[in-house]
UniProtKB/Swiss-Prot annotation:
Obligatory cofactor(s): Zn(2+)
Protein name: Protease HtpX homolog 1
Active-site annotation: E141
Membrane topology: Multi-pass membrane protein
Organism: Streptomyces coelicolor (strain ATCC BAA-471 / A3(2) / M145)
Any single Pfam family the record assigns to this protein: Peptidase_M48
EC number: 3.4.24.-
Keywords (A to Z) from UniProt: Cell membrane, Hydrolase, Membrane, Metal-binding, Metalloprotease, Protease, Transmembrane, Transmembrane helix, Zinc
Amino acid sequence: MQSRFRSDRRLTVRMGVTLFLLGLLYVGFVAALIALLKSWVLVVVIVALVFGAQYWFSDRIALFAMRGRVVEREEYPELHGVVDRLAAMADMPKPVVAVSEMEMPNAFATGRNPDNAVVCVTTGLLRRLEPAELEGVLAHELSHVAHKDVAVITVASFLGVIAGLIVRFAFYSQLFGGRRDQNTLAVLAVVMGVSAAVYALSFLLIRALSRYRELAADRAAALLTGRPSALAAALTKVTGDIARIPTKDLRTAQAFNAFYFTPAFGSDPGLGRFFATHPSLEQRLDQLGRISTELGEAPAPGKA
């Protein structure tokens, strides 16, 4: 079903190109592993199991990792009301609503398609945001579901996960595997090298797509709600408050940066932007400012 979120051709093209390039990388990677390990059955079984688990259970994995739980309307009526209203406005299925008992203010969406999606917010976010700001954040997350970029990021991340697991396996095999002949050690070293290269390339491709999809979600949310200034206020508030959360608490969330409304850790300037999951706060606010002008949105009180 086509939602009322404005389609983004540039996002669609970028997702297609990213998946195509990752597909080529994936085919080459599997071929290299089969040639090196001389066991195509083992390689195919491992790849299929990891891919299946990541694709079909991505929502449960993310909720478990971030201590999220599905909540009913009776427990969070206002949250359900906002999601109901936005889903109706966007003409899309209502996702499952979840809450994570975390002080870090944030939100994320996960799931393999719009009919099997979850939107999760932290209690820290619910305590900090005004209703209009929360609506903007949830519209941002729903747009990820409608544009299907959540599923694309999940699938795209699969190659990096496989490569990372193989690097670790090869490393510990060398470390604790006892005496090995030179041929075995050489094969393990090559497997580690190939896997590390694949991980690095897939990492950069996914990060580039992730940064653009965040801008696309901001744009879609602002146009759906008609209140880009509320989303801008939420971005500013959440980014500032995250900076005050203890670092040890943020490290738990860092692995899921690509799925969050704002990253647990910001990127360093310069080359750091190529490794970032999100565009800078300035980029996001500039875009929302332009949309606000285009829509003729009235300035907030005290900002005229």
